[in-house]
A protein has these predicted regions:
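GNAT-family acyltransferases
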Residues: 1-117, 134, 138-141, 149-154, ...
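Conserved acetyl-CoA-binding loop-helix of GNAT-fold acetyltransferases
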Residues: 121-134
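Charged, low-complexity surface patches
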Residues: 124, 148-149
Length: 181
């Protein structure tokens, strides 16, 4: 298994490219994180009250600095999602493997932040596909868990795509969906 924190792979398919988020992505990502329609779908659990709604380039740059520091400290990987048809960043996806003495042991925890116009079932399936295929090898995880609030109907449908993964409710939190292969 390659160490994702030493060499972060570029992932993708015909529609989307996922590459580690860098400072140069800030301007385009600001369009995502200033999208008021998108913010309610962002998972900000354990983020010290940050809801990821940013209005300035400086705020976005500061967040990317944090993501880069988190990568260097092996906390998580954050990829920018590029729409191949436009070449522009349309969101980010974060992942890490959680080791714990509970239901989520060896679980890859995933956060997906998208511009609101990309909150469509087929688009989300296409974005998730390359990462879910590689997650066990990249992170050593046995399953993947993410959150999708009830209002995120398209996202919830995408998390039920017939792709070989089994989707189950994540215990006591009705917004958490877990995927197991």
């Amino acid at each position: 298994m390659k160490d994702v924190y030493v060499e972060c792979p570029v992932l993708g398919n015909e529609a989307f490219l996922l590459q580690r988020t860098v400072k140069a992505d800030a301007q385009e990502l600001l369009e995502v994180y200033s999208d008021e329609k998108a913010v309610p779908f962002f998972n900000s659990d354990n983020c010290n009250g940050d809801n990821f709604f940013y209005r300035t380039l400086e705020q976005m740059q500061a967040e990317i600095n944090f993501w880069e520091a988190s990568y260097r400290s092996r906390a998580f990987v954050r990829w920018s999602i590029f729409d191949r048809s436009s070449g522009r960043a349309v969101g980010t996806i974060e992942m890490f493997c959680r080791m714990a003495d509970d239901f989520f042991n060896k679980t890859g925890l995933l956060r997906l932040d998208l511009k609101s116009e990309y909150e469509k079932e087929d688009v989300i399936c296409s974005i998730l596909e390359p990462l879910l295929e590689q997650a066990p090898e990249l992170f050593g995880c046995e399953s993947v868990s993410t959150k999708a609030v009830k209002e995120a109907a398209e996202r919830r449908k995408a998390l039920e795509c017939p792709d070989g993964w089994k989707y189950v409710s994540g215990g006591s939190d009705p917004d958490r969906l877990s995927v197991c292969k």
